[in-house]
């Protein structure tokens, strides 16, 4: 079983699925799933996959996205697996290349659970990385009989995302029922991903996004730490096994006016560009520099933007660039 599990990881990681060209990954999932008894597969016009296993009044649900950011993918690309990590490599070009573990790790977890459980729903979305295109056009009725939605689509090993862009994602009862703290996870807020798009379409059940063991996402130095991936799988299995009731939840946007999202996104674009040039600014600097331009944003908003930037581009990368230059 360990060998088969590792082999499945490597097969999945070799698949190249940039945004808008996810068909190879879709075909891999389709061929994998159709061998599992009692499974119904559907695909919508935009290319999202919907999978239902078993016949029940309510279902646990896992979602993930099919696409990846990396555009560098040599013909001899292979996934190298050691005892501890998985990374992409081109022997011909003698360089590391990104796995697309964001969100192939989520896909792997979803498919592992599909084999294990008799009752489960999965949804796989296209083009998350270019603006949640697939989830914004998802068939929302598919989720009507779901108890909750889990999305393994976060870097690292300890984050359980319960709020995105001031929108709460889950009820306190569901968060408590997950038992996440026993698995080393802690509650925090996150960035735009598919479950937020579902919430904005009116999804009325609890959702969370979980760290699933990938690091340095969106780069050619991306790696999967296998133990952290397995840690996420263990938490997902615990939630499926223990959260057997439906956990209703309506998103709450706390004290924000309509249009704040546009201003926040515009400010983030400008600040990201500034920090790309020089990382000498702190949160207070950014607030005083941009407050007159974006008056509806407060200090907490600037802290979110600052944190999001360094989540995507860790400080070590900037130090490396300085040394190289």
Task: Please state what every model-predicted region is.
Residues 52, 56-119, 129:
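Active-site metal-coordination/substrate-binding segment of hydrolases
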Residues 15-58:
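A non-catalytic alpha/beta surface segment that caps or lines the substrate-entry region
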Residues 216-281:
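His/Asp/Glu-rich mid-to-C-terminal helical/loop segments that flank catalytic regions of hydrolases
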